[in-house]
């Protein structure tokens, strides 16, 4: 059994994904150790990211003091998850992740994983895009990275035997300073509350996906 | 075995998630039927969305004619995936999804799944936010929804025995009109190329997640 599987309590993809629901009321007595939280973040961070820049940053909120501070930048509607969760992982977008773009891809080349021609193509195509990008594009790019890693964290939490809830009902101005991060570098994206469900969550339905799908002629 | 599991070729979460890599070269001879594509989209759409508004729209590109049209709005760097994939699912954000907000949540109440008090709280908290939202916020909100459903589609593709690649290297002005969608309503987010890998993809490494994690004091 691979190292990764040993960490998982539930390796059943269909159950983890299709029986996932947003839990907003957790058992407040359940603690999750920081080692396990860090492991879950690392597992979630196997998600893809634009140019493998991993434009995400995680702030864990898992003490009463941290929760009190954190709630200053959270909408009241989301207090139940924050109060009862074992931990919240807030995911912020890093709009300066491309500063190390050259190092990241030079290393891939030095490790012999891509050709010089491919390295030049990658550096020639995307690095100029990032170096000349508008703040809006860098926020958009980082928002995508943070959302895909957030989706994996929701699934990884279930695979570790917990439930979770993603929320963006926050104060977008206050959040980054509240977390002690640099507002010039980081943008707020979403919080993921993690813990053991204390009650059966609301099972929402979905539109028929066919009504949201076109086939390009 | 649940209905969902029957569709899956690979229900091993750890393998699907941790052994996933971005494939850019597919076997061009492999076809994926539209029924199976539609099923994969429906399975991916079990993803969460802000207020369950499902602010995503899917356009499938799976014929030579559609690919030729689609490539007019794709960066050359991503032509290999487009040319060789069995299909591309382009995910666009729906910035008008909240127009049906009241209907969505009234139905949840009429189905007896939430109390009147909860309905009033939901409608009172978020509907005004959406009705007064800036275009930027609606784009941000839809981008998150499209990214989480995109992440699930990457995993669902592997669970169906395929591989996939997410890309946003596109022409952001041209894409929506090229897909025949209303640019006043939809915003481009990402394409997901799906097929059978024709060669072993590049295995990228990740930063140590501990270096990207803080614990709020």
Curated annotation (Swiss-Prot), chains A, B:
Is involved in a saturation metabolic pathway of polyunsaturated fatty acids, that detoxifies unsaturated fatty acids and generates hydroxy fatty acids, oxo fatty acids, conjugated fatty acids such as conjugated linoleic acids (CLAs), and partially saturated trans-fatty acids as intermediates. CLA-ER catalyzes the saturation of the carbon-carbon double bond in 10-oxo-(11E)-octadecenoate to produce 10-oxooctadecanoate, during linoleate metabolism. Pathway: Lipid metabolism; fatty acid metabolism. Its cofactor is FMN. This is CLA biosynthesis enone reductase. GO terms for biological process: fatty acid metabolic process; response to toxic substance. Pfam families: Nitroreductase. GO terms for molecular function: nucleotide binding; oxidoreductase activity. Keywords: Detoxification, Flavoprotein, FMN, NAD, Nucleotide-binding, Oxidoreductase. SUPFAM superfamilies: FMN-dependent nitroreductase-like. It comes from Lactiplantibacillus plantarum (Lactobacillus plantarum). Changing residue 51 to S: Almost no change in catalytic activity. FMN binds at residues 20, 22, 24, 78, 81, 165, 168-169, 206. It catalyses: 10-oxo-(11E)-octadecenoate + NADH + H(+) = 10-oxooctadecanoate + NAD(+). The keyword Zinc does not apply. Belongs to the nitroreductase family. 10-oxooctadecanoate binds at residues 51, 118. Homodimer. Its EC number is 1.3.1.-.
């Amino acid at each position: 059994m691979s190292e990764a599987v040993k960490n998982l309590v539930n390796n059943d993809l269909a159950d983890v994904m299709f029986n996932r629901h947003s839990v907003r009321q957790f058992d407040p007595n359940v603690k999750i150790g920081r080692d396990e939280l860090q492991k879950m973040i690392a597992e979630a961070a196997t998600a893809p990211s634009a140019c493998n820049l991993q434009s995400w940053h995680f702030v864990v909120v898992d003490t009463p003091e941290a929760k009190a501070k954190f709630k200053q930048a959270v909408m009241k509607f989301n207090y139940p998850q924050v109060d009862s969760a074992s931990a919240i992982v807030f995911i912020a977008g890093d709009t300066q992740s491309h500063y190390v773009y050259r190092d990241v891809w030079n290393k891939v080349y030095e490790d012999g994983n891509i050709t010089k021609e491919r390295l030049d193509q990658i550096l020639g195509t995307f690095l100029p895009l990032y170096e000349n990008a508008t703040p809006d594009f860098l926020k958009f790019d980082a928002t995508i990275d943070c959302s895909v890693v957030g989706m994996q964290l929701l699934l990884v939490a279930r695979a570790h035997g917990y439930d979770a809830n993603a929320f963006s009902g926050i104060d977008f101005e206050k959040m980054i300073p509240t977390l002690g991060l640099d507002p010039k570098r980081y943008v707020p994206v979403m919080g993921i509350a993690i813990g053991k469900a204390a009650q059966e969550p609301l099972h929402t339905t979905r539109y028929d996906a066919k009504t949201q799908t076109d086939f390009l002629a």
